[in-house]
Amino acid sequence: MIGRLRGIILEKQPPIVLLETGGVGYEVHMPMTCFYELPEAGQEAIVFTHFVVREDAQLLYGFNNKQERTLFKELIKTNGVGPKLALAILSGMSAQQFVNAVEREELGALVKLPGIGKKTAERLIVEMKDRFKGLHGDLFTPAVDLVLTSPASPGSEDAEQEAVAALVALGYKPQEASRMVSKIARPDASSETLIRDALRAAL
């Protein structure tokens, strides 16, 4: 089981980061809320990982701290929620925002997330709220020293295309993703900024 990686970022293609550790490059799928905090390519980063084995693939999901990983593990225990949907949930909301939405039973906020209908949202509230009772209140308080960060890079010519592709990977339909990015697009924005703004606007 791979639980933690420390290495150099070779490439960032939302929501995937390619991290080199010991001469091996690992593709790590990350929620956009975690992806935003990564340093730029060529710099060192630490990610806490969860390894998922499927019939057709072996996937690594990465997080900036153990608390976010814990929430991801709890999410995929929920009936009808797989790793891809859990990734989309934690891309649309931070771990703390999700915990707050569940504890306050904010159904409206949850159904705005990609792939979450009313029934799934209700199930999340019932199942996750019960699990939170057995966890410490500060479990999902973000750690401050687990990843090295740096300012975001300037926008590129294909920033909008990258943003649309990332939203599609998170579960949005292509037309919907394009519309979301078009609403908030601006020439100087990086793909990460566009994705973050698009997700915020959707909520």
From Swiss-Prot:
Q: Anything noted about its domains?
A: Has three domains with a flexible linker between the domains II and III and assumes an 'L' shape. Domain III is highly mobile and contacts RuvB.
Q: Which residues cross the membrane?
A: none
For this UniProt entry, what is the primary localization, expressed as one broad class? cytoplasm
Q: Which UniProt keywords apply?
A: Cytoplasm, DNA damage, DNA recombination, DNA repair, DNA-binding
Quote the protein name from its UniProt record: Holliday junction branch migration complex subunit RuvA
Places the protein is found: Cytoplasm
From the UniProt entry, list the residue stretches annotated as the region Domain II.
65-142
The reply to whether DNA-binding figures as a keyword in the UniProt entry is yes
- Which Gene Ontology terms of cellular component type are present? cytoplasm; Holliday junction helicase complex; Holliday junction resolvase complex
Biological processes, Gene Ontology terms? DNA recombination; DNA repair
Renumbered to this chain, region (Flexible linker) spans 143-154
User: What task does this protein carry out?
Assistant: The RuvA-RuvB-RuvC complex processes Holliday junction (HJ) DNA during genetic recombination and DNA repair, while the RuvA-RuvB complex plays an important role in the rescue of blocked DNA replication forks via replication fork reversal (RFR). RuvA specifically binds to HJ cruciform DNA, conferring on it an open structure. The RuvB hexamer acts as an ATP-dependent pump, pulling dsDNA into and through the RuvAB complex. HJ branch migration allows RuvC to scan DNA until it finds its consensus sequence, where it cleaves and resolves the cruciform DNA.
Chain intervals for the UniProt region annotation (Domain III): 155-203
Annotated organism of origin:
Salmonella schwarzengrund (strain CVM19633)
